[in-house]
């Protein structure tokens, strides 16, 4: 995803995201150390910063991190790192977040395992992502379309896969919900800077314009005190 599109989406979603995170993850005590894994340009980090002690954001995209650092408040810092191999010790964070990242990850099960590893016992892990279909043919078609639109796309995970990864790491699911979003394809193509030739190629397998996606929101707890 281009930096320009990422920043535009962050601006569009920021108010709703902050409200949703406060509802799903609060109340906060202002003492929490938070990890935003796959932070992009900092949407989750910036939403949580006023309510916690510290947020560390990690991403593999240097351009995203540069943009995030330019806007970061004093209690937020960013590091270049891979969500499947986090550069942190066991149980370092009170809250671990992974927002719209797993569909970009080749081995999402490793990412969830790392999220669980760095979370403190008794504390929360938050995952949100666009969901895939349980129908394998529909899922393949949607993944094909998403890869044309965003070369970093790997695979949309069905709800059951995400629940399975949480289960495999002995994480207790506290809450989950699914929301629906309308996506304006032409607006996304414009913001991403595609040429007209590229736009024609992407429009071909597009489900519709606008089209609807489902986003799953999961809050889990790591066992222990």
PLM region descriptions:
Residues 1-38, 43-47, 63-67, 71, 126-148, ...:
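Conserved class I S-adenosyl-L-methionine
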Residues 41-85:
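Class I SAM-dependent methyltransferase SAM/SAH-binding core
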Residues 97:
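A conserved beta-strand element that flanks and buttresses the S-adenosyl-L-methionine
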Residues 109-121:
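A short glycine-rich, Lys/Arg-flanked "PGG" loop and its adjoining helix->strand segment in the class I
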Residues 154-170:
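Short alpha-helix
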Residues 172-225:
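Conserved Class I S-adenosyl-L-methionine
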């Amino acid at each position: 995803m281009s930096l320009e599109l990422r920043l535009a989406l962050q601006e569009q979603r920021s108010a709703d995201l902050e409200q949703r995170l406060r509802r799903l993850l609060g109340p906060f005590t202002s003492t929490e150390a938070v990890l935003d894994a796959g932070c992009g340009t900092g949407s989750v980090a910036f939403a949580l910063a006023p309510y916690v002690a510290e947020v560390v954001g990690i991403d593999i995209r240097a351009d995203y991190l540069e943009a995030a650092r330019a806007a970061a408040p004093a209690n937020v810092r960013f590091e270049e790192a891979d969500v499947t191999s986090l550069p942190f010790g066991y149980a370092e964070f009170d809250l671990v977040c992974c927002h719209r990242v797993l569909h970009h990850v080749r081995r999402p099960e490793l990412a969830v395992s790392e999220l669980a590893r760095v979370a403190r016992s008794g504390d929360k892990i938050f995952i949100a992502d666009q969901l895939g279909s349980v129908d394998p043919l529909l899922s393949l078609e949607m993944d094909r379309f998403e890869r044309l639109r965003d070369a970093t796309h790997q695979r949309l995970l069905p709800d059951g896969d995400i629940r399975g990864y949480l289960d495999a790491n002995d994480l207790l699911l506290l809450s989950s919900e699914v929301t629906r979003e309308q996506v304006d394809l032409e607006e996304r193509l414009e913001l991403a800077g595609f040429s007209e030739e590229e736009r024609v190629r992407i429009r071909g397998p597009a489900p519709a314009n606008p089209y609807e996606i489902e986003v799953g929101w999961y809050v889990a707890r790591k066992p222990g005190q």
